Amino acid sequence: MALLHSWGYKTISIELLVKAIQQGAEIPIRPIILTFDDGSETVYTDALPIMQQYGFTGTVYIVYNYIGAGLFMDRDQIRELHAAGWEIGSHSLSHKDLPSRPGKQMDEIDSSRRRLESYLDVPIRSFAYPFGAYDSDSLKFVKFAGYIAAVGLGDISVQSSENIYYLYRQSVTSETTLEAFVQFLPWKP
């Protein structure tokens, strides 16, 4: 986070990115979106305080069935993230590979949004495909369910209206070296 901050990066939400793509909304000079999948409690205990030190916010994609289970955030923690300026998105009901469940995709996509909005009382505007896996039905159901965008995984840093329902992200884990992370960044000092 210190590196991103020192290089002038500013966090934005998926919603702002969509407005910039579709309506020409203004975004900072070096925008970055920091996303976290699944809803691990470490997002609340570790990522939130560190990111707040640098004035950063993130987008967390919640698996509805994981809320409050084991090492996942509970309702209050997720709502605190939202109150701190974080965007909350859906990561499905049960984190299953969607294309391998053709009869369940719509429920995984649509019900997760409706249940999250009802349970958390926060808007759910974007979706993250579990494992980055999708097919033409997944895209159709995400649009039908009322999401404004969806994210997956990939190497392309240029986002456009052509891929609004499969915006690309880089996967960064505890094993990602600083050198590898820097290679993901489009703007360097």
Q: Where does each model-flagged region fall?
A:
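C-terminal active-site subregion of NodB/CE4 polysaccharide deacetylases
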Residues: 1-35, 40-44, 95, 99-189
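Short, well-structured secondary-structure segments
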Residues: 10-15, 33, 52, 56-68, ...
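Acidic (Asp/Glu)-rich catalytic clusters
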Residues: 48-56, 73-90, 143, 161
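Acidic/histidine-rich helix-loop elements
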Residues: 64-66, 71-72, 100-102
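Charged helix-capping and loop-helix junction motifs
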Residues: 71-78, 105-109
